[in-house]
Amino acid sequence: MTSLSADKVERLGFYNLQELLEDDNLTYKIIRSCVSLNSAITEITKEDHPELSKSFFETANYLYPFGILTLSKIKKMNYKDVEKEYMDKVSSQTADYMHFMKENGVTNQSFIKGTFIGDDLNFCNEIRSAIEITISETNKLKSKN
C-alpha cells in the first residue's frame, strides 16, 4: 500500500455491526466507505465484466441514501447541502479505492488479491443484509398493526 492509499483506504472489517448501531459517526464512515468501495469496483469491472459490475452498482445504490440519512442526522444541515457533501466525499473516496486497487493490480496481477478488499466487500454485504432485514421486519410489524 502506498502512503497515499494508506491514509485514504482503511480496512472496514475491524468493526462489527453492534459498534455501528452505537455510533452514528462510525455508521456514516462505514456506509460511505461501502458505497465508495462498491462504486470503485463497478467502475473497474464494468467494461470487462458488465454483469458482475451490475451487482456492485446495485449495492452502492442501495446503501447510498442511508449514508445521506446518517450524515444529515449527524450534521443537522438541509438535505441539499448534506447530499452535496456526501456525494463529494463518496466521489473522492471512490477515486482513492480505484487508485489503491489499480496499484495492487500492478503488484499482484489482481485488484483484490493480497488486500483486505474482499473481506470489506463481505462486511459491506453484511451491512446491506442487516438493513434489508430490519426494513422487512419493520414492514411486517407495521402490517400487523
Where are these regions (language model features)?
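Compact alpha-helical subdomains of small soluble proteins
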Residues: 64-145
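Short N-terminal segments immediately surrounding and downstream of signal-peptide cleavage
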Residues: 1-25
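Short N-proximal segments of mature Sec-exported proteins
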Residues: 20-77
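Extended hydrophobic/Leu-rich segments
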Residues: 9, 31-34, 38, 82, ...
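Alpha-helical protein-protein interaction elements
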Residues: 6-7, 48, 78, 89
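Generic signal for short, ordered secondary-structure residues
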Residues: 13-14, 46, 102-103
